[in-house]
Amino acid sequence: MSIIAITVFVAGYALIASDRVSKTRVALTCAAIMVGAGIVGSDDVFYSHEAGIDWDVIFLLLGMMIIVSVLRHTGVFEYVAIWAVKRANAAPLRIMILLVLVTALGSALLDNVTTVLLIAPVTLLVCDRLGVNSTPFLVAEVFASNVGGAATLVGDPPNIIIASRAGLTFNDFLIHMAPAVLVVMIALIGLLPWLLGSVTAEPDRVADVLSLNEREAIHDRGLLIKCGVVLVLVFAAFIAHPVLHIQPSLVALLGAGVLVRFSGLERSDYLSSVEWDTLLFFAGLFVMVGALVKTGVVEQLARAATELTGGNELLTVGLILGISAPVSGIIDNIPYVATMTPIVTELVAAMPGHVHPDTFWWALALSADFGGNLTAVAASANVVMLGIARRSGTPISFWKFTRKGAVVTAVSLVLSAVYLWLRYFVFG
């Protein structure tokens, strides 16, 4: 069974990477083969957290997509777009820095998928107003979302899994992860000129945008107030997740339901903007990866790698960093972390105890979160952003993303390794 699972997964991944076939079709077809071959049971598809569809992710995306769709009808995205351009004096690099910082902060406080859903429409409007290619901006924002989301417990789904299995708190993540994220963010800002390239705004459009009054962009203040109230409540519930223990997916769906009820919009007004292709792609991808988990392929690889360390703590941390980032970049960091957590638990118990046991959890979190920047399908935020780009008429190819992502991931891992070594082995 494991040979069939590996063959189907590799073939499907190659087709997704080729950009020649709809990735949604590929994912659903591969998922159907996995189920048809008996690798993943029909019950597992719908009810298994490790081998089936992660409904928390699906419903979180659906709820936030509906909220963002309703929010579009207020004109607030046009307002923010004009404000950002004027604030940066229409300079593309300054605009990119501003949007990247907003994305990173939003991802840390909320979660990276929600932030991407909110920032992408603003970015597309800014680029459209200035007549510049939106691809560098969207790619940079995805990188920032994965980096910024690593800072807190609620910022990235893998962090939530790690916190649950290791008994870590919101404050633990803030104290131990945020410093590393700050260092990597500084490096990412330094890479922005390279990511931007030779993009320049059209002079005529710059003059037109600078002359606009952003307040005139708001054309439904009543709906904006309703959206604002719902978003504040939704975001507050996200932040209070460790206390309330209410799943973010449920919060997002409740928020979407309230907005739909009181917005006065027609059903087609908010459902037409939902990224149905993206949701179906995720469903298929979860089953594809679940087949590798179900057959024990991922666990066997992880165990074989960790046995090589022989109890050396520094080598173990380095191995976790070196293995987790590329593997997370290939099979999606959420199911990978779900599989690795019991293995790290065993590792912690087997170590001699010269460094704090949580060091291994921070290594897993940093490598899995930053590994999410490696490929176009490595993290939920990546898939969502590329789906939005495709629908806007500016598709981003798998390899265009990966060429940039490989560099950003490599820099992030080197800085993470130095951070872990200095903090926990030299000064710890």
UniProtKB/Swiss-Prot annotation:
It is found in: Cell membrane. It comes from the Bacteria. The chain crosses the membrane at residues 26-46, 51-71, 90-110, 135-155, 177-197, 223-243, 278-298, 314-334, 359-379, 407-427. One of its GO terms (cellular component) is plasma membrane. It is a multi-pass membrane protein. The keyword Transport applies. Its main location: membrane. One of its GO terms (molecular function) is arsenite transmembrane transporter activity. Keywords: Cell membrane, Membrane, Transmembrane, Transmembrane helix, Transport. Belongs to the CitM (TC 2.A.11) transporter family. PANTHER family: P PROTEIN (PTHR43568:SF1). This is Uncharacterized transporter MT2759. It comes from Mycobacterium tuberculosis (strain CDC 1551 / Oshkosh).
